[in-house]
Regions:
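Residue-level detector of alpha-helical transmembrane segments in integral membrane proteins
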Residues: 2, 56-58, 87
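Carbohydrate-active catalytic/glycan-binding domains of CAZyme proteins
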Residues: 26-27, 32-34, 63-400
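Ser/Thr/Gly/Pro-rich low-complexity, disordered linker/stalk segments of secreted
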Residues: 36-76
């Protein structure tokens, strides 16, 4: 019998995850996220079927804890250095934008807010802000899945600047749109503000997109192409209902509030070992004529959660997975790093932002929280690499 070997990068990723978990668990007991986490009852995939940023009913019946021990740096950073995490609090699914040298980060619901927000002058020191989206659209509301939550469930925000105003895309339940398992679909809304801190207002009467027959639509991000065309990128929430997960792209109207034409399947599916049954959190950038689609895969409440990417020569695709995936994976003390965004600093350097658990406290059911990390993203000769996860001191953004 011929035995197939696992490709080198994926074998290394698997060994890192297993070794880290064995060390974290003392070599005994169940491994969180690798057979030790119960799947959502409504999911046929076996992975967490809850939306990114919100614990599944199976893994946690309560909102995220107010505090727990987060990842800690190995040493104290010196002058011109920093250490992860840069936001040492529960700040899941972080999306960061640069507005004239000031950085704004948006994150999934927490602390009684619909969404969280923070601002920084250097990507390292962050100041927490008020809820940027204090009111949701009329079509949004609580669902049975989130009936115990003290506030409406909103997550995975992504902001963009359009001329003199700001647009915020976010995911929330749409009560009138039933998905195949009979529950309300998770759909994408869009809100507008005059300032990046908000308040963002959503006056729409329906989601900007909601593929209810495909499980719903979540994890949207904005992309501005070099020719001025604007696009919305998202995933269908197929893992809710045993449906294949795909990424989609569709052109936006000039004001960013409507979609034009029809969505295009970007050609990436949850079909590789490291992704297990879930891909999510698409982030699209362009460099030197190549389009890079970053995304996360696997169960977000596990050490197997990681970041990969795919490339294409056309913005609509088809995109092809990089052979070296995943490029950001569990590495002590960062557990299950993912749901990334990419931001360019004032020197033109790229940074990937993502959340990560402390490897010894992965999952809300284990007292964990998802802190925000940043690491350098290097793109050379069509290949993307990340210098991380890095917990120890490293040169700070814009540092000489």
């Amino acid at each position: 019998m011929t035995r197939r070997s696992i490709p080198g990068p994926r074998r290394a990723w698997a060994l890192v995850v297993v070794a880290t978990l064995v060390a974290a668990c003392g070599g005994a007991g169940s491994t969180p996220g690798l057979g030790g986490t119960s799947p959502d009852p409504g999911s046929a995939s076996g992975a967490s079927a809850s939306p990114s940023g919100v614990p599944s009913a199976a893994s946690s019946g309560t909102p995220p804890p107010a505090a727990s021990e987060g990842p800690t740096a190995a040493a104290t950073p010196g002058e011109g250095e920093f250490a992860n995490p840069v936001i040492d609090a529960d700040f899941p699914d972080p999306h960061v934008i640069n507005v004239d040298g000031t950085y704004y980060a948006y994150a999934t619901t927490g602390g009684g807010k619909n969404l969280q927000a923070s601002m920084s002058e250097d990507l390292v020191e962050w100041e927490m802000l008020v809820d940027p989206l204090p009111e949701l659209a009329s079509w949004s509301g609580l669902t049975p899945l989130f009936s115990d939550a003290p506030h409406k469930a909103t997550w995975a925000p992504a902001a963009a600047q359009m001329d003199d105003r700001f647009i915020l895309y976010y995911t929330t339940p749409a009560l009138e749109m039933e998905r195949p398992d009979g529950r309300p679909s998770q759909c994408i809304g869009v809100a507008v503000a005059d300032d990046p801190t908000g308040p963002f207002v959503d006056e729409s009467e329906a989601p900007i997109v909601c593929q209810a027959d495909l499980g719903g639509s979540i994890d949207s991000t904005y992309f501005l192409d070099e020719d001025g065309s604007q696009y919305l990128v998202w995933k269908n929430d197929g893992n809710c209902c045993g449906i294949e997960t795909r990424f989609y792209i569709q052109e936006l109207s000039p004001n960013g509030l409507e979609l034009l034409g029809e969505p295009t399947d970007m050609g990436v599916a949850n079909d590789t070992m490291w992704e297990r049954n879930v891909i999510e959190a698409p982030t699209l950038i362009a460099r030197d004529g190549t389009y890079y689609l970053f995304f996360s895969g696997n169960d977000f409440a596990s050490a197997a959660y990681a970041v990969g990417y795919a490339t294409a020569e056309d913005v609509l695709g088809p995109y092809e997975d990089a052979e070296e995936n995943p490029i950001v994976a569990t590495e002590r003390p960062a557990g299950g790093p993912g749901h990334q965004s990419v931001v360019e600093d004032e020197d033109g350097d790229l940074w990937i932002t993502y959340h990560a658990w402390d490897v010894s406290h992965i999952g809300y059911q284990n007292g964990g929280r998802r802190a925000m990390w940043i690491d350098r993203l290097i793109i050379e000769d069509g290949t993307a690499t990340v210098e991380g996860p890095t917990a120890g001191p490293q040169p700070a953004p814009e540092a000489p």
